[in-house]
Every structure is written in structure tokens, then in C-alpha cells.
Amino acid sequence: MPQTADTNRRVVLSERPNGLPDAKTLQLEHGEVPTPGAGQVLLRTRYLSLDPYMRGRMNDAKSYAEPVKLGEVMTGQVVAEVLQSNCEGYALGDHVLAGSGWQDYALSDGTDLRNLGQTPQNPSWYLGILGMPAYTAYAGLLEIGAPQPGETVVVAAASGPVGATVGQIAKIKGCRVVGIAGGPEKCAHVVENLGFDACLNHKSETFAADLKAACPQGVDIYFENVGGKVLYAVLPLLNAFARMPVCGVVSWYNLSGLPDGPDFGPAIMGTILRMKVKVQGFIIYDSFPPSLFKDFIRDMTGWLKSGEVKYKEQLIDGL
């Protein structure tokens, strides 16, 4: 993310959205580059990750984290470079993982940083395949889903960073993996490049029937990222004692009220009861022991080196 000399560009939350965010939701501001005080470091953002959870942080509602306040910098995880340091343990040129959000420069006392060293290889990976999205996939699938060889795993949003990683780990664990994505190009990528056994286009008029045909033995694990009609299509296919890690419900994030159509609440709860389904929502920051992250880094590093996990980034230059 290139900076403007002597200017700190900040994207702030200017208005809470009602439904889809629009041009009034965020505002670009220009301010002075902050000066670090005693015990502080000055950070320059190099990479910013844009993730679905940010939509929820725009709402003034009870959640796992405080909402972004009006006028505050929009939240986000970044890889940043230390430009000045008055903080022990951080030197000029260190790269760090920080939560400083949508801005060119930020100050930190170091307590919220993870030092990646002077010259980390592929620094942007710490926002993706070696960071929060892939760790979400790893922990949710292995700790909640507990996949066993021969089971069928269905992954919503299979072409995204979380879903793509879930499916590849499930294949490593010996499962049949069926992805769900939006469009034939995404589905082709999921099967041809990521190695899923099948991928269904949720935009197809025959989606529910196609999903049923792709899961002849039913569904043992459904990794939920989407909600909505995808969830409703999976429900009748769940086997007894199926597991459903709930990572997100992105199709509902921009709703300002209840979704249109029939009330599926009774069907959802009835299926959970009859089929004895384990449904567990989780937030990656506080749902698992800290030691699990070390296991993730060890395993993912090995899978990347062996080629068992493949990773594709989309990088956009500029704020």
C-alpha cells in the first residue's frame, strides 16, 4: 500500500450502513503522519487484508468484538514495516502483523504486534495462507469438524481463502470433498487447481439436485460460510452425528431485516435434533488454545512445501 509523503491517508467509518454499504459508509481522510512517543513504534502499512468480518464491525450491535465507532479508522489486519522504534523488541525495518486498519501509518506500543522479522518471505501470506483465514479453516475443520477418512465434507464459499483451505485440508485427511461456489469459473478452479472431488454452482437452477447427486452417501461435515439457500440445500443431506462448524453467514450480512421467503427456523432446528447434528459457531481469536496456532504453522508450512496445499492471492495496489 504506497503512502503519500508526509500524509497519512485514513479510511474511516462515516455512516452505519442499512443493508449494503454505499458511498456514504466510508470516507477517505488525510492527516499528519503520527510521531511515536516513549515505548511506541511508527508503522507503515505494506499489506491490508479485506475480509468479510469487516461488514459486521460496521453495525452497532452486540457481537464478539466492539463495533467500529463513527469517525474511527476501519478495522483490518495488516503487515506493516517499522519506520521508527522507541519500543524494546522492535527495530527499524522489522515487519509486523498488526491490527491497525485502513491507513498508511499507525502507532503501537508493541503489545498487539507479532514480529515477522526483517525480511519475511512472502509477507502477504501472513494475512492469508499463514494467517487468519487459513488458521480459521484449519481450526474449524480439525477441532470442530474432526474429519475421518472416507467422510463427505461440503464446503460453502469454496473458492474463497477459508473455503479453499478447508477443502484441501479435508482431502489431506482422506475425505470426499464437495465445494459450493458462485459460477462455473470458480467451480472449475476449485476442482482443477485445488483438487476438490466436485464443485456445484449455487447460482444454477438445479443446484439442490446437483448437490444431492454429488453426495450419494450424505454429508458428514458441512463447513458453513454462507447461510441462506446453500444451508437449506445441505440440511436434508446431513447424516446422523454430522458436524457443522459455523464460520460465517455471508449471504445474510447485508440484510436489514429477516430474509424474504418462508421461515426455515423449524426445519433447521428439527434437522439438528433428529440427526443429532453438532453445530458450533467459532471466532478464531478466542475459541481455541494458543498452542493450536503453532500446530497450524507447522502443518501448513509442510503442506505448502509438499504442494499438498495450493494458494492464490489477489493483490490490488493502493488504498
Predicted regions and their residues:
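Glycine-rich beta-strand-centered segment in the early N-terminal region that forms part
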Residues: 32-50, 58-102
